Structures are given as structure tokens and as C-alpha cells.
């Protein structure tokens, strides 16, 4: 996956997770979106600040 594609995918997954939480939907589904974003970011070796943002989202659900 190209960096631009990976960045777009991570952005989409973060928005999905945030929207699920914002609208009181399943925390499990939000966690799944954030975990998938983490995997995409790691595989594409995206910048550390992006990965830290994802980790913060996951920590908020712990």
C-alpha cells in the first residue's frame, strides 16, 4: 500500500472510530477501527506522531 493510500485509510478508520464513539455506538467497533488503523500505520511505516495519535485513541478505550 502506498503511503498516500495508507494515510487515507488511517484517516478514514480514525474518523469511523471517532464517529462511532461520538454517536454512542459500540466501543468494540470503534476499537476495531482504531486497531486496524494501527496495523495499517505500522505496515506502511507512517510517521511516529500518527502512530502515537492512534495509540492515544486506543488508550482512551481501555
Task: Report residues per predicted region.
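N-terminal acidic leader/helix
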Residues: 1-28
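Acidic, Ser/Thr-rich low-complexity linear motifs
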Residues: 1-7, 46-56
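Residue at a conserved register position within TPR or TPR-like alpha-solenoid repeats
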Residues: 20-21, 41, 62
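Alpha-helical junction/boundary sensor with strong preference for TPR arrays
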Residues: 24, 41-44, 48
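Glycine-rich phosphate-binding loop at the start of an alpha helix
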Residues: 31
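Conserved structured catalytic cores and adjacent interaction surfaces
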Residues: 37
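Alpha-helical linker/edge segments of TPR/alpha-solenoid repeat scaffolds
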Residues: 56-62
Amino acid at each position: 500500500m502506498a503511503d498516500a493510500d495508507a494515510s487515507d485509510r488511517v484517516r478514514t478508520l480514525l474518523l469511523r472510530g471517532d464517529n462511532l464513539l461520538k454517536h454512542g455506538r459500540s466501543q468494540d467497533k470503534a476499537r476495531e477501527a482504531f486497531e486496524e488503523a494501527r496495523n495499517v500505520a505500522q505496515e506502511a511505516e507512517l510517521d511516529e506522531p500518527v502512530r502515537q495519535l492512534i495509540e492515544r485513541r486506543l488508550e482512551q478505550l481501555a
